[in-house]
């Protein structure tokens, strides 16, 4: 048995075979392609197009702002173009038969006109300040106010086509670029993840670990700061705690503090007796400067037969020269005294009172304006100068004597006082002061009253 035949089926198959055998160019010729126009333009160089009726002719395109009226009649001839009328435009070279209509900014979309339509460009529409463009389609947009980020902070500011990006504070969540209170959050919404507080353990542990690290550091820094302030005050004001001062500052206790328990008037030294030639409590004036150290002769009163002119340091008794209470009357009420001198036969060696007279003569011989400079040359530190000044703030003369006495205690015993003083005064261009000092030691001028301190 053969296959059943359907009337007309054979004829349809034959026609289909004939169509498949036809060349593809013939098929495409039946349906014009969308890119025909571009293919035709590609046959001509840039800036020209194919004549609409003669494919062998390439005509020049019309400039922007114009449109095509008629093609060029022949190669090398100009195309006939005409300028666009008001309300129309062409934004590039073209061979359009008519210009494009200008668009209008839509007020219902809150659009504003940025620049008007011209023959060579379309109208430019935009938004007002603090607005952005929300596109409803590829060409249509609506102007929307930028979010002010209330109850939050601005992460990314508002741009031309993008709203503000906000970071909401605690207790708020982000909904359509606005921070909304968590009280408006309903169950089974995405905001529940943002509004629910984190687990208690996650919050507590970091705080505990941070506190455990920071608290000891804060306590340690506080103790260091208090210790520094305490040491600074003790070194600055040593009268407060003399024992602590001597331990911390590694400096001997100030002389006044050491001798505070002694009587106001110390007993006279066995090597010293009142005479009419010398009084250690008196100051000696220094009228001027004249000669160096070596050129000044020594008076017989202070010669080697009477006392050691420059005794060793170990023979100096600090209590005789350093205690400012002995000379407190010089800073308060003038008291008449008699002139004293040495006795040769009873006491052959009197180094303590001799140094006392020399130191007071130096105090009176150096100008007060250059006293600190003098003591720096003698080797006293700035700290010690200030300390002795504060201890003897009531009397400048006693402060100067305390500085000299402190220097004398630390001077090697083989160095004598006047020789060192003379060298220092020479460096300071005050060598003449030594002559005045020696003159005061040779001839102490008797007076009825003690000279007031400077």
Swiss-Prot record:
GO biological process: aortic valve development; cell surface receptor signaling pathway; cell surface receptor signaling pathway via JAK-STAT; cellular response to mechanical stimulus; cytokine-mediated signaling pathway; defense response; defense response to bacterium; extrinsic apoptotic signaling pathway via death domain receptors
Transmembrane intervals: 213-235
Pfam family, one: TNFR_c6
Molecular function GO terms recorded: signaling receptor activity; tumor necrosis factor binding; tumor necrosis factor receptor activity
Known glycosylation sites: 54, 151, 202, 376
Post-translational modification: (Microbial infection) Glycosylated at Arg-376 by S.typhimurium protein Ssek3: arginine GlcNAcylation prevents homotypic/heterotypic death domain interactions.
Topology in membrane: Single-pass type I membrane protein
Ranges facing Extracellular side: 30-212
Limits of the Death domain: 356-441
Keywords of this entry: Apoptosis, Cell membrane, Disulfide bond, Glycoprotein, Golgi apparatus, Membrane, Receptor, Repeat, Signal, Transmembrane, Transmembrane helix
Annotated compartments: Cell membrane; Golgi apparatus membrane
Residue intervals on the Cytoplasmic side: 236-454
Oligomer status and interactors: Binding of TNF to the extracellular domain leads to homotrimerization. The aggregated death domains provide a novel molecular interface that interacts specifically with the death domain of TRADD. Various TRADD-interacting proteins such as TRAFS, RIPK1 and possibly FADD, are recruited to the complex by their association with TRADD. This complex activates at least two distinct signaling cascades, apoptosis and NF-kappa-B signaling. Interacts with BAG4, BABAM2, FEM1B, GRB2, SQSTM1 and TRPC4AP. Interacts with DAB2IP. Interacts directly with NOL3 (via CARD domain); inhibits TNF-signaling pathway.
Domain notes: Both the cytoplasmic membrane-proximal region and the C-terminal region containing the death domain are involved in the interaction with TRPC4AP.
Entry function: Receptor for TNFSF2/TNF-alpha and homotrimeric TNFSF1/lymphotoxin-alpha. The adapter molecule FADD recruits caspase-8 to the activated receptor. The resulting death-inducing signaling complex (DISC) performs caspase-8 proteolytic activation which initiates the subsequent cascade of caspases (aspartate-specific cysteine proteases) mediating apoptosis.
Name listed for the protein in its UniProt record: Tumor necrosis factor receptor superfamily member 1A
Name of the coding gene: Tnfrsf1a
